[in-house]
Amino acid sequence: MVARPMDIIFDSNSHVTLTTLDLGYSHIGRHGAKYLVDALQNNQTLTTLCLRYNELEAVGTEYIADLLRNNTTLITLDIGDNRIKSQGAKYLADALRTNKTLMVLDVKRNSLEDEGVQHLTDALKINMTLTLLDLRSNRIGIRGAQYVADTLRNNTTLNTLYLAFNQIQDSGARHLAAALQDNKTLTRLDLGHNEIRDQGAQYLGDA
């Protein structure tokens, strides 16, 4: 049998100390994602995985989510720029409900929109380990901001949240500001480039 390239590169017997794997901008696609996950199933050392800009889409993201369900070492996952959309977000959210180790999740520039954000924020009402979530450039509107706000009211682990380059506007800022009055753990919130004007700034300032 001819070995697949991913199996050769990630043979767990020869890479027992691998902790960081950066495959960003490698165009591995959905099929490459499956090979990668198969090769990493038994890995017990990897803590950081970067898959940015790899054309994974929702199908490839489902394979990554399967890895998250069983993995007990991965701390950081960068899956930005992969067009995973709301369905891909749902796969990740389902995995986050059971994963106990992931602390950093980067899903920027994935066209998640409000529906995708709802999937992730619902999972964060259960997940108690994630500390950083990057949602920049995901076409998140006022409704999506409300989903985020609802989660922030009760979440006690998230300390960093990136929401820049969306369409949250003043009304979305009002939802977030109200949630910040209850939240005791968030220390960094990036809301740049969100069409937030004077009124939105006042809401946030009052919080």
Located regions from the model:
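Leucine-rich tandem repeat or coiled-coil scaffolds
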Residues: 1-207
